């Protein structure tokens, strides 16, 4: 193999698995270190640079970082990354004087953001400090989009939403509530705005067209029902409730039902548990509240008697799974009727754009989603950009934030007459930690502590009111115990081949056998010849230049490395060094600064 190009920013970025997995590329190890030092406000601002809403995401993020966490390779559970984000938000001081502000003198460009959800708010966060006149059009009488209407208050308190959204609106953003856009064509033809961003989410819940569907008012669409609960249009439900679907919305529906008076709630899943879309922690939280999750039941018919919903008919399924772990086929082996008073359908969401005319140059695909460039976020009509669920269908908040950052860059470039594709690349900065692991690690040995459980409000107390937040958050002391589980994956092992004397000291001391000195070969050959076979092809091998004494190469399996620094401490020549990698992510402010405009970070 050719020597690894460690100058490529993506190489060390991928080694920091949590940051690489985060769509917004939040610098997780850095903010965890700041928490460890008691610098909660700094940790909050480090989060805010990339994910904009630390307090919100510290409660409801889908956590793509945690399955990627390297800690999960040395024991069962990853670091509680998401909950540590909340620690930064809960324990910070007043940070308003550290937030970006809008300049008094505008740059003469106006942008319209349709929808006041997380994607649009991220665009506003990035563009308002650059002098853009930002107008947000929101159909509802409140901000937050699906964060407010579809995430229950017992998970995400309104005061948290209001505070973090307020930080952005205070940047001289013109917010027009109760102002739906009825016609995109009319908005564009007005020539009032230089660019338009669509961040309206995926607001249409999927229906289930089965016999009896329209014969009872007690059959509800999940996201519509949650919205009605959020606005207090619904405050009760029957004692026996069936939830159809097993995604995160289904989990919110079943737990909300309990708070409205349901006594017996069942989540009905067509497939086995291993195929669920809901996050593991969402399932655990529902089961803690005694929700019954029933697998292998495929809905067949709503049972109506004398105009009243009395139950649902299900096929009981058995599934064959192929060698790749996918369901090959399903067979109905029985039929069962389960009594109920209400049914809530939570089987997915779709985009809905009745207000976007189909003759204005915006192309839609077969699923009625706009055709959007995944880099620039612009659709097939110049000057119109999409992000969040409205761009590529339902995902989650952190994806919407990432889309918002990219769209803001593109909108800035579009308004300034620049090439949208000509974007600043990611950078990487390496700084030595030569003084030993005490300079960066939490302890001089591996910390075997198990993941801390989030403390919850007692079951007897949490159902008294619908807005009692269940998760209490970590105390500062509890946070300290959890941060010590972080392996500091951004402290990289950096190798200098010309200094190596091939003494094998690093190989001998490595606790995971991730190092091998061997003759070079192709990748498949090297993976088989390592001290411990490198089976994870998604994680690259590090291969050095030829070593000066024998011409052999140093090979490192990045997948196994736990960044313990023993190789660097043992090396007699300094060939191994521990260096902190910092990924430099460009935002709209950086693009403006590079072009000679406003300086500073829009997400600071």
Predicted regions and their residues:
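Flanking helices and flexible, charged tails adjoining ferredoxin-like Fe-S electron-transfer domains
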Residues: 1-8, 79, 85-107, 133, ...
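Iron-sulfur cluster-binding cysteine motifs and their immediate structural context
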Residues: 12-37, 58-88, 135, 142, ...
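Feature captures the FAD/FMN-dependent oxidoreductase FAD-binding
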Residues: 105, 110-114, 162-210, 301-313, ...
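FAD-site-proximal beta/loop scaffold in flavoenzymes
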Residues: 215-239, 322-394
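Glycine-rich dinucleotide-binding loop and its adjacent helix/turn
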Residues: 88-104, 163-180, 205-260, 364-381, ...
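A conserved FAD-binding loop/helix module that cradles the flavin
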Residues: 253, 390-415
